[in-house]
UniProtKB/Swiss-Prot annotation:
A Pfam family matched in the record: ABC_tran
Membrane spanning residue stretches: none
Lineage: Bacteria, Bacillati, Bacillota, Clostridia, Eubacteriales
Record note on quaternary structure: Forms a stable energy-coupling factor (ECF) transporter complex composed of 2 membrane-embedded substrate-binding proteins (S component), 2 ATP-binding proteins (A component) and 2 transmembrane proteins (T component).
Stretches assigned to coiled coil: none
GO cellular component, one term: ATP-binding cassette (ABC) transporter complex
Keyword terms: ATP-binding, Cell membrane, Membrane, Nucleotide-binding, Translocase, Transport
Protein name, UniProt field: Energy-coupling factor transporter ATP-binding protein EcfA1
NCBIfam families: ECF_ATPase_1, PRK13648.1
Species of origin: Acetivibrio thermocellus (strain ATCC 27405 / DSM 1237 / JCM 9322 / NBRC 103400 / NCIMB 10682 / NRRL B-4536 / VPI 7372)
Entries under SMART domains matching the protein: AAA
Residues reported to bind ATP: 45-52
Cited PROSITE patterns: ABC_TRANSPORTER_1, ABC_TRANSPORTER_2, CBIO
Record domain ABC transporter: where: 6-246
Its biological purpose: ATP-binding (A) component of a common energy-coupling factor (ECF) ABC-transporter complex. Unlike classic ABC transporters this ECF transporter provides the energy necessary to transport a number of different substrates.
Length: 285
């Protein structure tokens, strides 16, 4: 049985407003979930559903105002645990330009290990391994501001990999990228998950990205309201739409075909699956 890397027990989080007199804004409510090591989980939900707050709790940037969150078996509210928790979970944020601080790619990737006192020879090894993992070995001497958006996010991921995390959380990390950049980053994430068993928690509003995960958490009004694999989640087209979310175009097409009386599956997600299914229907006609 795989170890549990994230466990939330009745977690709530409330933001304080400007003054003590004004009420707190409760953005997470009675949140309960478990995520095992090696899972690839997408988290979706409309704006204001609590996705980004949940992401920041996972790295102990924020601490629950109620309930208990365990990361790698350690409670985030215990200050003595924070160092280890932040080494266990790395964060990649929305804007790649806000995460790169050095004047060369290799210096940026080395920044984290240098700041925790890793020996120089080990840092060199980690930088090379991290850049190889994200496919940027040939760019190690490059100036970060000369890179594309997708390449910059891959540098940010490499910087986290150099810290040897067990889990990477991406908070809308592809939202500012063009389709090519998103494709680059998603390939890296899948490789890290499948080849290196790194847990991936991907906060996204792109449904075509969510279907690449092995599990999807759907959030609404601070709660996890749906939990399942992509086929289970996106077969519930009307429920997803009622939550203010889009569904993958292929899933919506087959939902409409089914409503019109066609005998088609309700769990088709990709263009390739759609082509095969429609070809079989035509052949039988």
């Amino acid at each position: 049985m795989k170890d549990i890397i994230v466990k939330a027990n009745d977690v709530e989080y409330a933001y304080k407003k400007n003054s003590d007199e004004t009420p707190k804004v409760l953005v997470l409510k009675e949140l309960n979930t478990e995520i095992c090591e090696g899972e690839f989980v997408a988290v979706i939900g409309r704006n204001g559903s609590g996705k980004s707050t949940f992401a920041r709790l996972l790295n102990a940037i924020l601490i629950p105002t109620r309930g208990v969150l365990y990361i790698g078996g350690k409670e985030t509210y215990t200050e003595a645990n924070l160092w280890e928790i932040r080494r266990t979970v790395g964060m990649v944020f929305q804007n790649p330009d806000n995460q790169i601080i050095a004047t060369s790619v290799e210096e940026d990737v080395a920044f984290g290990p240098e700041n925790i006192g890793i020996p120089s020879d080990e840092i060199v090894k980690r930088v090379e391994e991290a850049l190889r993992s994200v496919g940027l070995e040939e760019y190690k001497k490059a100036l970060p501001h000369h890179l594309s958006g997708g390449q910059k996010q891959r540098v940010a991921i490499a910087g986290i990999l150099a810290m040897k995390p067990k889990c990477i959380v991406l908070d809308e990390a592809t939202s500012m990228l063009d389709p090519s950049g998103r494709k680059e980053v998603l390939k890296v994430l899948r490789d890290l998950n499948e080849k290196e068993n790194i847990t991936i928690i991907h906060i996204t509003h792109y449904m075509e990205e969510a279907i690449l995960a092995k599990r999807i958490l759907v959030m609404d009004e601070g709660k996890i309201v749906m939990d399942g694999n992509p086929r289970q989640i996106f077969s519930k087209v009307e429920e997803i739409k009622a939550l203010g979310l889009d569904v993958p175009q292929v899933a919506e097409l087959f939902h409409e075909l089914k409503k019109d009386g066609y005998n088609v599956p309700d769990n088709i997600l990709t263009v390739e699956e759609a082509v095969q299914c429609l070809a079989e229907m035509i052949a039988k006609a």
